[in-house]
Amino acid sequence: MNRLKFFLLLFCVSVFLSNCASNEKIEDNKENTFEVLTYSAELSETITLDNSEIVLGKSREFKYWTKNYQNPQNNIAHIKTSAEFKNKKKIFSGSSNYINLIQPIYFEGNLCHVKKKGFLVCKKVEGKEEIINIDIKNDDIEKYEVVRGGITYFDNTIIFVDAYGQIKSIDVDNSKINWETQIDFPILSAPLIYRDQVFFISADNRIFSLSFKTGEIQWSFQTIEESKKNLFTASPVAIENIIIAPFSNGEIIAFKVDDGQPVWSENTSKISIISNFNLRDITANPVISGNSIFSLSSNGRLISNSIINGARNWNVDISGSQTPIISANQIYLIDNEARVICINKSTGEIYWIRELEKHRRGTDSKNLNLWTGPYLINEYLYLISYFGDILTISPFNGEILDEDK
């Protein structure tokens, strides 16, 4: 049995819960009607593009998943697995009356997650033997109402951060705390371990760098604080000696890993009188592919920038909260209007658009059919809805191939 089978399903559900929570303020728009090929006045397929040019990158099987979106570039691309969305088995039990925004992690056959009562629990996937069960919540609380922050693994160590400003290093072998550090603001992003440093973003729009070995703060940088933000924030990405952080005011800023010196900055939000009253947060993780970084804001644009100097390659007026998937020369994403979009990575032109069901019945918020994904698995795109539907879509033309309700 493929060990990733259980984890893949749990991962998708975890990201799905994050998607539901990130859209707590919703305004209904009853005038969203779309014509063929032009689904809005601002977004349309590029007629000159040929869908036959779409070629998927080589799929690969992941043996571990030690952070949210697997790697420091947040680029999971094309997944190869024998897992199926059938015969699902429960590894962890829990309740549905709370929100858990922390994605589980998988390493060396172990699956770890944070429970409502503030316990970090790790189990062997095969056999379900419990290897870690420790209380990591703040001493002043009984349980989490909303589980925010994140966990990541490296070198026999789990790093945990939460919305109470806690940062803890936990030894996997003996479940003991190596060190712990406290900051004054909630931590809303999952941590990133990179080059012996721990990076995360706090609610006051500050990126921190801590020593992986001691927990000592190496450097920090604060940009303009934003009062309107989602329940969670996207995580930093890194490549070579560059760490790039997405902030809740729509900014992305590149820093030198060693000393935190800013290198370049960009703003993904559309600036206008109207947009100043809306969320400009970035909840979709930026993705690094090749020499470019691709950033999607909750109320703004999808932007491609050079990693080296931040020069803008192109931008498209698309808003979304789900991390894009990049395979070969295509970007796949779902926007806030429940449209699955395939974009040319080099130019920002649109190959195809597939509109999904935005509301199940009525147009009020309780009937809003939030979608998570897409995930490119075994040459198919998969999306999961708020109501538990699983869609299978062709990555070549956007055709809906299967709908499991």
How would you name each of these model-derived features?
Residues K124-K128, D171-S175, S211-G215, K256-G260, ...:
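Short loop/turn segments that connect beta-strands within beta-propeller blades
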Residues N29-E45, N51-K88:
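Blade/loop signatures of beta-propeller domains
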Residues F85-I105, E129-T152, N178-R195, I217-E240, ...:
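Extracytoplasmic beta-rich repeat domains
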Residues F16-N19:
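C-terminal motif of bacterial Sec signal peptides marking the signal peptidase cleavage site
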Residues A21-E24:
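Bacterial signal peptide processing site
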Residues E108, K115-K116, D155, D162-A163, ...:
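Structural signature of WD-repeat beta-propellers
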